[in-house]
C-alpha cells in the first residue's frame, strides 16, 4: 500500500524528484495525516479485501505528491484504473491546489470515477 518506487530515467540527477508508482487500486486515500494511513494499514491487515473480491484499497501521504510532475505521473499511472479517490486535507485547499485541480480533471474524464475531498480542520 505505501510502497514508493522510482521510475528509472524519470528524473534528472540532483533534482530531488522521485516519481511515485503504486499497484492499481479500486479506491485510494490521499491524506496529509500519517495516522490515516496507519489506520488504513491496520484495517487492511485485518481484512485485505474490505471492498469485496477483486477490489482493492490503497493510500499515500500527500507530501509525496507535492511536485507537479510527480502528481501528474501518479495520476496517469497509479490512478489510471481507480474508481474513487478520497483526499483528506489538513491545512486547507491552498496547500494542494494544483493537486485538487488535477484530480478534479481525473474524475471528470470518466463517468465511473469519483473524487471526495474531506477537510481535516474545522474551518474548511
Model segments located where?
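An N-terminal assembly and electron-transfer interface module characteristic of large anaerobic redox
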Residues: 1-124
Amino acid at each position: 500500500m505505501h510502497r514508493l518506487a522510482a521510475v528509472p530515467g524519470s528524473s534528472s540527477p540532483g533534482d530531488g524528484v522521485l516519481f511515485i508508482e503504486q499497484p492499481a487500486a479500486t479506491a485510494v486515500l490521499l491524506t496529509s495525516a500519517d495516522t490515516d494511513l496507519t489506520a488504513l494499514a491496520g484495517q487492511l491487515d485485518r481484512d485485505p479485501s474490505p471492498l469485496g473480491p477483486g477490489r482493492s484499497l490503497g493510500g499515500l501521504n500527500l507530501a509525496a505528491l507535492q511536485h507537479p510532475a510527480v502528481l501528474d505521473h501518479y495520476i496517469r499511472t497509479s490512478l489510471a484504473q481507480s474508481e474513487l479517490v478520497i483526499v483528506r486535507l489538513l491545512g486547507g485547499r491552498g496547500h494542494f491546489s494544483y493537486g485538487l485541480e488535477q484530480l478534479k480533471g481525473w474524475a471528470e474524464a470518466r463517468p465511473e470515477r469519483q473524487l471526495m475531498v474531506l477537510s481535516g480542520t474545522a474551518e474548511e
